[in-house]
Amino acid sequence: MIHFSRSLTRLLGELKKLPGVGDKTALRLAFHLLKSPDNLTALAESLLEVKAGVRFCSVCFGITEDDPCHLCSTERDRTTICVVEEPQDILAMERSRAFKGRYHVLHGALSPLNGITPGDLKIAELMKRLESGAIREVLIATNFTVEGEATALYLTRLIKPLSIRVTRLAHGIPLGSDLEFIDAATVQRAVEGRSEL
């Protein structure tokens, strides 16, 4: 077994916490960074900058440096809210250029088997936004997974009694896929072909 210095071992451990990074990738990344101290310094500084400056928007719960975020403070359709699971899903929707409304990030999906309940998500905050009476449509853009579908159904049951139109992305997106990995054209077709729930 190879023994590394304490600091390198710690770096490897931290890198392996990233999604999709195992032992080999962590080692490759660590040695790449060590070859170029300037890159290592720049990475460390950018991580500290993100930690200090990036937060969640108090309106949509997307990622921002300004509060409210750019999408919440610009002139977009204020009558439509697109509900997504994670902040990166906003990027997928924006790449399509098909959606012109506002967003709401749940920060997950319902998953009773994993202990994720409505109280763990930003559902209460969504319902509070809907109380204003200005919202005419909620587009549910949760992932097409069991958890995403369960979340969409749960939200539909909460929102329908408010006489707000509830729509879902069209099912042109493959079942079991995550929205953040879908190409812009497919997302655009899905937004244009959304259907009432």
Swiss-Prot record:
Keyword DNA repair in record: yes
Stored Pfam families: RecR_C, RecR_HhH, RecR_ZnF, Toprim_4
GO MF terms held by the record: DNA binding; zinc ion binding
Cited InterPro entries: DNA_Rcmb_RecR, Rcmb_RecR, Rcmb_RecR_Znf, TOPRIM_dom, TOPRIM_RecR
Zinc finger (C4-type): 57-72
GO BP term, example: DNA repair
Entry keyword annotation includes Cell cycle: no
Record domain Toprim: where: 79-174
Keyword terms of this UniProt record: DNA damage, DNA recombination, DNA repair, Metal-binding, Zinc, Zinc-finger
Function text: May play a role in DNA repair. It seems to be involved in an RecBC-independent recombinational process of DNA repair. It may act with RecF and RecO.
NCBIfam families: recR
Family: Belongs to the RecR family.
Protein name, entry field: Recombination protein RecR
Organism annotation: Geotalea daltonii (strain DSM 22248 / JCM 15807 / FRC-32) (Geobacter daltonii)
Highest classification ranks of the organism: Bacteria, Pseudomonadati, Thermodesulfobacteriota, Desulfuromonadia, Geobacterales
Chain's gene name: recR
